[in-house]
Swiss-Prot record:
This is Rhomboid protease GlpG. GO terms for biological process: proteolysis. Belongs to the peptidase S54 family. Pfam families: Rhomboid, Rhomboid_N. One of its GO terms (cellular component) is plasma membrane. Keywords: Cell inner membrane, Cell membrane, Hydrolase, Membrane, Protease, Serine protease, Transmembrane, Transmembrane helix. It is a multi-pass membrane protein. The keyword Protein transport does not apply. InterPro entries: GlpG_N_sf, Peptidase_S54_GlpG_N, Peptidase_S54_rhomboid_dom, Rhomboid-like_sf, Rhomboid_protease_GlpG. It comes from Salmonella paratyphi A (strain AKU_12601). One of its GO terms (molecular function) is serine-type endopeptidase activity. The active site is at residues 201, 254. The lineage of its organism: Bacteria, Pseudomonadati, Pseudomonadota, Gammaproteobacteria, Enterobacterales. The keyword Transmembrane helix applies. The gene is glpG.
Length: 276
């Protein structure tokens, strides 16, 4: 038997299995931390991978729902936990995703209790030449948020995008994207506004760029971002640049992060194509 892929959502896994059954290919699901899909007849592996790439590009296509009805398997027989929302939060995020989220929450609470300035003195980008060897400052600015909406918006995107990268490509890949984008987006932002800035948005934009381009160029990676969302991200950058909403935003970090993410995805998919 050959393992084809894994899905965090068992219903999505069942939809793909049902569709392949209508195509004459029998797949089985084994439940572990995720729903692992296995193929008994390995001679059909290439065909399954082609169909999987199409499925990942548009899992909501009506033909997949129709396949579930046709196969008579609209009830997958899977048992779901009583708290599906909490289960989804846990299953979609790996340890790095959770650690960064926890760090952001802890820092936000500290800023609320003892004041923004006190925390920024310890975590902000080096604001004095004598601080340039305090290496953590080049990265810890991503943990600081200045309003509830600011942190909620960033953590939601971080969980959605960072969790997908970590689950599909590994914790190491998420760490590399986070470290590089935090450093470069922070460098650009301090050139625009000085050292007094914070937020995870530079990393979030890097993840947006990475996930979108990686999904476009390498569908078998299992990660993708709908084109409408990347268009929204670009429009948000334009709106922020011209201050249409009257909010102070780290425009330099957003643009730099997006470029970093696109560049990393291009390099990764270039290497993947060379290997194939």
């Amino acid at each position: 038997m050959l393992m084809i892929t894994s899905f965090a959502n068992p219903r999505v896994a069942q939809a793909f299995v049902d569709y392949m059954a209508t195509q004459g290919v029998i797949l089985t699901i084994q439940q572990h931390n995720q729903s692992d899909i296995w193929l008994a007849d390995e001679s059909q592996a290439e065909r399954v991978r082609v169909e999987l790439a199409r499925f990942i590009e548009n899992p909501g296509d009506p033909r997949y729902l129709a396949a579930s009805w046709q196969s008579g398997q609209t009830n997958s027989g899977l048992r779901y936990r009583r708290f599906p929302f909490l289960a989804t939060l846990r299953e979609r995020a790996g340890p790095v995703t959770w650690i960064v989220m926890l760090a952001c929450v802890v820092v936000y609470i500290a800023m609320s209790l003892i004041g923004d300035q006190t925390v920024m003195v310890w975590l902000a980008w080096p604001f004095d030449p004598v601080l340039k060897f305090e290496v953590w400052r080049y990265f810890t600015h991503i943990f600081m948020h200045f309003s509830l909406m600011h942190i909620l918006f960033n953590l939601l995107w971080w969980w959605y995008l960072g969790g997908a990268v970590e689950k599909r490509l590994g914790s190491g890949k998420l760490i590399v994207i986070t470290v590089i984008s935090a450093l470069l987006s922070g460098y650009v932002q301090q050139k625009f506004s000085g050292p007094w800035f914070g937020g995870l948005s530079g990393v979030v934009y890097a993840l947006m760029g990475y996930v979108w381009l990686r999904g476009e160029r390498d569908p078998q990676s299992g990660i993708y971002l709908q084109r409408g969302l990347i268009i929204f991200a670009l429009l948000w950058i334009v709106a922020s640049w011209f201050d249409w909403f009257g909010m102070s935003m780290a425009n330099g970090a957003h643009i730099a992060g997006l470029i970093v993410g696109l560049a990393m995805a291009f390099v990764d998919t270039l290497n993947a194509r060379k290997r194939t």
